[in-house]
């Protein structure tokens, strides 16, 4: 009886370990930070009346990456550049607005995101020609507009919440992390070819 109980216990523990590993969308991997991290910001004694929403993108693809994100409640940040193996963080800080009933000040649901853009295989900012910025009509680009989420999507997409790692540091600060892979590049190629085909048809 004791042997049976011990065996069942071991099987249960092994099952839990296997489940927790497979359920983690972002297994541990080191990335080089190219700008301030969430931990850096929060170590600077942030204003306790503000809400801090961090979005971090890790470039696990074979291509250089520019990325942009904004939310439905803010204009969003700038365009960030990551070489393979690098990661960058943007902070979207918001204040409570009592006159807005539906105001998402702490983003704990991805439906608060407005859209995300990925641009692949471009030179670093200093190496781009003057006045040249990445755009969806010239470059390999994937764009995602968050009119609806796509949970458990058969293809990898940032609109699938299971592809993100969510961390809540406090009632005033959270971080969302997305790992960009070659699957995102393939989707960018597909979208780009589709846009170019539509442009040719229009001409």
List each model region and its residues:
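N-terminal hydrophobic targeting signals that begin at the initiator methionine
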Residues: 1-2, 20
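Sec-dependent signal peptide recognition
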Residues: 2-9
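C-terminal motif of bacterial Sec signal peptides marking the signal peptidase cleavage site
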Residues: 15-18
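Intrinsically disordered, low-complexity segments enriched in small/polar residues
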Residues: 20-58, 62-203
């Amino acid at each position: 009886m004791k042997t049976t109980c011990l065996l069942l216990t071991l099987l249960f523990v092994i099952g839990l370990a296997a489940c927790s590993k497979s359920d983690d969308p972002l297994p541990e991997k080191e990335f080089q930070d190219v700008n301030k991290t969430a931990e850096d910001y929060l170590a600077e004694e942030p204003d306790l009346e503000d809400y801090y929403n961090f979005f971090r993108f890790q470039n696990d693809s074979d291509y250089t990456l520019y990325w942009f994100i904004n939310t439905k409640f803010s204009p969003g940040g700038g365009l960030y550049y990551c070489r393979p193996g690098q990661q960058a963080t943007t902070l979207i800080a918001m204040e409570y607005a009592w006159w807005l009933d539906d105001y998402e000040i702490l983003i704990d649901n991805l439906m608060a995101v407005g859209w995300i853009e990925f641009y692949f295989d471009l030179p670093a900012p200093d190496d781009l020609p003057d006045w040249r910025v990445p755009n969806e009509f010239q470059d390999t680009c994937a764009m995602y507009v968050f009119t609806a989420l796509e949970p458990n999507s058969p293809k990898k997409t940032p609109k699938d919440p299971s592809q993100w790692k969510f961390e809540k540091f406090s009632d005033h600060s959270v971080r969302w992390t997305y790992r960009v892979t070659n699957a995102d590049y393939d989707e960018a190629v597909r979208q780009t070819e589709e846009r170019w085909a539509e442009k040719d048809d229009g001409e």
